[in-house]
């Protein structure tokens, strides 16, 4: 039963990430791939504070979205998904410290996706200045989502007991 719950939770979390990201991209075209992304589905990263199933769920949801979105950069399915994996893994390890844990997606996506964007869009090739700017822009979007929508989701799930009812 425990393994079934884990797989079910991971699948539902991945499907929610995939569907929310596509919905946002449908409603506001390309908003999920701007330099300063406000990818609302990233708020689901807070689920890593409640269940280890969020790690494969969010990683696979991100991977499937990046593979299915024609506007995604060629390496994004690997780089973006790996950043999500590292962020969620770190958040799970930091679950007793939720406020600093919320910064992990900004840290890993800022560095890895910032590097990727600099490779593709750096006008003079890869420079540290261009990388720093790209990393900062990606991190700003992540921080905005996690410390608004993510924190709201976290507080709602803890204060209402929803996290305990869903994840045990």
Task: Show where each model-derived region lies.
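Small-polar-interrupted transmembrane alpha-helices in polytopic inner-membrane proteins
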Residues: 16-17, 21, 58-66
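Membrane-embedded alpha-helical hairpins and interfacial helices in multi-pass inner-membrane proteins
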Residues: 25-34, 63-168
């Amino acid at each position: 039963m425990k393994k079934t719950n884990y797989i079910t939770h991971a699948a539902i979390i991945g499907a929610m990430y995939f569907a929310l990201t596509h919905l946002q991209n449908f409603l506001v075209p390309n908003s999920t791939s701007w330099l300063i992304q406000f990818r609302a589905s990233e708020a689901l990263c807070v689920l890593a504070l409640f269940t280890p199933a969020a790690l494969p769920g969010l990683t696979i949801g991100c991977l499937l979205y990046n593979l299915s979105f024609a506007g995604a950069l060629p390496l994004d399915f690997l780089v973006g998904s790996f950043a999500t994996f590292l962020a969620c893994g770190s958040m799970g390890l930091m679950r007793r410290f939720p406020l600093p844990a919320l910064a992990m997606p900004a840290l890993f996506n800022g560095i890895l996706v910032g590097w990727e964007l600099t490779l593709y869009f750096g006008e003079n090739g890869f420079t540290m200045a261009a990388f720093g700017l790209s990393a900062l822009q990606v991190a700003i979007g992540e921080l905005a989502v996690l410390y608004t929508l993510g924190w709201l989701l976290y507080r709602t799930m803890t204060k209402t007991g929803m996290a305990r009812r869903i994840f045990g």
